[in-house]
Amino acid sequence: MVNWQVIGQLVSTGLIGLLGPAVIILLALKKGNL
């Protein structure tokens, strides 16, 4: 049996970990401040 709850938590945590820095970088690029 696959534990979808654990997989969902891992995926959501991974997405947040990847999207967090990406959003910060995009905001920095839009402001022109790196």
UniProtKB/Swiss-Prot annotation:
Bilayer disposition of the protein: Single-pass membrane protein
Gene Ontology terms describing biological process: photosynthesis
Signal sequence range: none
Superkingdom of source: Eukaryota
InterPro entries reported for this sequence: PSII_Ycf12_core-subunit
Transmembrane segments: 6-26
UniProt KW keywords: Chloroplast, Membrane, Photosynthesis, Photosystem II, Plastid, Thylakoid, Transmembrane, Transmembrane helix
UniProt key word Membrane: yes
Matching Pfam families: PSII_Ycf12 (PF05969)
Assigned GO CC terms: chloroplast thylakoid membrane; photosystem II
Biological role stated in the UniProt entry: A core subunit of photosystem II (PSII), probably helps stabilize the reaction center.
Family under the similarity heading: Belongs to the Psb30/Ycf12 family.
Complex formation: PSII is composed of 1 copy each of membrane proteins PsbA, PsbB, PsbC, PsbD, PsbE, PsbF, PsbH, PsbI, PsbJ, PsbK, PsbL, PsbM, PsbT, PsbX, PsbY, PsbZ, Psb30/Ycf12, peripheral proteins of the oxygen-evolving complex and a large number of cofactors. It forms dimeric complexes.
Listed name of the protein: Photosystem II reaction center protein Psb30
Phylogenetic classification of the source organism: Eukaryota, Sar, Stramenopiles, Ochrophyta, Bacillariophyta
Gene: psb30
